[in-house]
Amino acid sequence: MNENPAYKSGFATLIGRPNVGKSTLMNRLIGQKIAITSNKPQTTRNRIQTVLTLDEGQIVFLDTPGIHKAKNKLGDYMVNVAEHTLNDVDVILWLVEPTNFIGAGERHIIEQLKKTRTPVILVINKTDTVKKDDILAFIDTYRKELDFQEIVPVSALKGDNTDVLIQCILKYLPYGPAFYDEDTITDQPMRQIVAELIREKALRLLSEEIPHGIAVTVENMKERGRICDIEATIICERDSHKGIIIGKGGQMLKKIGSQARPEIEDMLEMKVNLQLWVKVKKDWRDSDILLKNFGYNPKDIEMGE
């Protein structure tokens, strides 16, 4: 496949305000669940690299955290990762919601995009939530703000028009051999994917004040015949949060585990024995050492990784 002189390969990044559907779109394009999704903003914390290999080319997607106003060191890290990525890729996909209103969050992104020479494709997501006739008006609103190479309306949830988007991305990639083997779908370590799946379930089940104050670490992951034993810890910032995560008689923790386990089993293609614990690390989102321990390393940005 790679000997084909017409073969293309390159990097695309998905940016946008928190909760516009970046992870849902990437999962749809790849055809497998890699990035966690929830109805709460700032679900994605690291750049997640996933790979789509086609007959005509290979697209390596970087799903970045949403660009937002940072409230702590973790927030700073997330914003820096997103903005640093813009100059490292061959094409940028900017995801927006179908609306005529351009808020402060979008204005901030527009300013960032004006600073880069990387081609930008505007992706208007969630088209399944509006009338088709209204989409043209949304396109006109955004077209006045920036010179986009392409504008593609899609529904990440339903998969509408995503095939057109893939062809648009390929158009802006350079010719060259694939970066990854054709059976590769992500460069994330398996432990990190398991931790993210557990965090996704916690995000969905827990009340508003807790989710962004949690991290998940996988302490142990061992195969025992046809079973994989996994020990993981949910880290929170307050003693009061610990009680909520565990729940009455351990019911909430059990619920998080029972929802995460089937998806982990599907991914590993084997039975999973999942043990969950909860630990308190006060104000971990403002501690450089703890951020590094939980996999958020600002030096990754400087190194361009």
Residue ranges and their predicted role:
Residues 1-87:
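Conserved G1/Walker A P-loop phosphate-binding module
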Residues 190-305:
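P-loop NTP-binding site
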Residues 21, 161, 252:
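Conserved glycine(s) of the Walker
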Residues 118-119, 128-186:
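Canonical P-loop GTPase G-domain recognition
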Residues 32, 51-55, 70, 85, ...:
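Conserved, well-folded catalytic cores of nucleic-acid-processing
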Residues 53-58, 80-151, 222-227:
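Conserved C-terminal guanine-recognition region of P-loop GTPase G domains, centered on the G4
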Residues 63, 125, 155:
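Active-site glycine-centered loops adjacent to acidic/histidine catalytic or metal-binding residues
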Residues 44, 68-69, 101-102, 130-131, ...:
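Catalytic P-loop NTPase motifs of RecA-like helicase/translocase cores
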